[in-house]
Amino acid sequence: MSEQTILFAFPGQGAQYPGIGQDLFEAYESVRHTYEEASDTLGYDIATLSFSDPDQAINLTRFTQPVLVTHHVACMRLFNELTGNRIQPGFAAGHSLGEYSALLAAGAIDFKQALSMVSARGELMGEYGQGEMEALTLEYADARALADEFYCGVAALNLTDQTVVGGLAEDLQALSEAMQQRFPRKRSTRLKTEGAFHTYYMVEAAKRFRAVLDANEFAEPAISVCSNYSGEFHDSTASSIRSRLFLQLFNPVLWVNNLNHVVDQGVNLIIEFGGGIGKGESAAEKRPNLEGIVKKTFRRHESPPEHMAVINRETLENTISRLA
């Protein structure tokens, strides 16, 4: 195939599901080693939590975040192993939590650091965060106007016409009712989260998380990594990376900006690692979390980037075959 400029991408919270990673765990020894390493770092059995979870603890933020990072890394490592490390990214990006996996992919942090940081991050977000989140099929300006009116905040710009807001449940309800009156053809969907992530309702969690960031060393990334906070690339200094990860907790995830920025830099292939969404229960029935956003973002682009994924055995085999 023609020369590719590649982005490694990692989804965020909401891409977890009971049984995540089990198909690859059972098939590949290297994946089992990744899960063992994660369990040793975290102090609990991440495989059991991921595969057999009758209490749905996987949906608690303090567990969701390490579960997803473990799956991100297991998928990426396996892909690298089976391709002989010949498919190298020029850039890395992650949505919210996924930004930590992107920094790992770039060599700025290692796996143990990523797990320790996101474990603390998830625990603090779950304990000190407030509120809920709502996805609106509105452009930023309209969503921001509604959020300002009802004591809410913009949490993410996923598409030009999909903006996520966060606030207290009663404020989101008032916002949703006002939206239905003013934009009757638009939709809103309540998201299942433990708080209004990426809004001012996360300030207390961020203040406490700063100590975790300050205690970690960050190496200069080997490739450019997108910052959700700025919408562009991280600076290479440790102090700047720490600061932007701190600010990311209570500011919007500028995901559509990240995607446009990397394509402006020449990215023509996006490979998504980990997670999965869809109503089916098994890993084989899941689809990539970010694929729809990528396709919608660039549907009118003259040269839209290709999207591939490694989230289960089928996508792993398909992606490797397409890149052969």
Regions found by a protein language model. Give the residues of each.
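Alpha/beta catalytic cores of group-transfer enzymes, especially the acyltransferase/condensing modules
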Residues: Q13-G14, L42, A105-S239, L247
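Acyltransferase
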Residues: R185-E281, E285-G292, K296-R300, E314-T319
